[in-house]
A protein has these predicted regions:
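Solvent-exposed loop and edge beta-strand segments that line ligand/cofactor-binding
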Residues: 1-6, 88-102, 158-177, 186, ...
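Aromatic-rich carbohydrate-recognition surfaces in CAZymes
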Residues: 1-64
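The tetratricopeptide repeat
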Residues: 11-14, 108, 181
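Catalytic cores of carbohydrate-active enzymes
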Residues: 44-59, 97, 110-193
Length: 217
């Protein structure tokens, strides 16, 4: 199956928001605890994809539907971020660290810590420690590798990076996306880097930007 980091973020987000909006806690059962442990383990393994058994090869004429290097994916360096095979759009990643999805992971790892601290679920201390460590390492990876510059020399977030110096300037018309970073709770909407990123994405510097008579984006 196509692996996307955000596919594991959403169950954690949904469980957390249900609790916060309604007070409901029945979702935090043994299955939730086990699933959370698996998510933390998988994201940790994929901090260095060389340790992962995941491969994806599809017989297709559409290069976006399969991974290069016999299903292993493109070359990368370890950054602290967690590796992704595919984007929310289901297209494969050009570079293996999808910044919006790593931002989303940072947010939901904070949710995990809050859930297990306040509700004192099974194995809380170990899960909190693992989530805190992973959150810090992914955030450090974002801070060290996720930035690039636009044509004006402004500091912006890249869409994807490989840790080897390559980066893409674009966005995905889904959530998570760079444009949706404040919506997800990753950064403030007035953040200087976010605003520069937003201006860049919503301009011809984004190769997928389109402007017509009545709309642009």
């Amino acid at each position: 199956r196509k692996y996307e980091v955000d596919s594991l973020c959403y169950p954690l987000q949904l469980a957390y928001l249900l609790w916060k909006e309604t007070g409901e806690t029945s979702q935090f059962d043994e299955t939730f605890v086990a699933a959370t442990k698996e998510i933390l383990h998988l994201w940790t393994v994929e901090q260095d994809h060389k340790n992962s058994p995941y491969r994806f090869v599809r017989d297709t004429d559409r290069k976006e539907d399969t991974l290069v290097n016999d299903g292993f994916g493109p070359d990368f360096a370890v950054t602290g971020m967690t590796w992704s095979a595919f984007r929310p759009s289901d297209d494969c990643c050009q570079y293996s660290y999808l910044i919006p999805s790593n931002m989303f992971a940072v947010v939901v790892l904070g949710y995990v810590q809050e859930i297990f601290a306040e509700l004192d679920l099974a194995d809380s201390q170990n899960i909190i420690a693992d989530a805190k460590r992973l959150q810090a390492e992914i955030q450090e990876g974002i801070e060290n590798y996720a930035y690039t510059s636009n044509s004006k020399g402004e500091k912006i977030y890249a869409f994807e990076v490989d840790g080897l110096g390559n980066a893409s300037i674009m966005d995905d018309p889904n959530v998570p996306s760079l444009l949706a970073a404040p919506y997800l709770g990753y950064c403030d909407i007035d953040d200087e880097v976010y605003q520069a990123t937003r201006r860049t994405i919503l301009s011809p510097e984004n190769p997928y930007f389109y402007q017509g008579e009545y709309a642009s984006g």
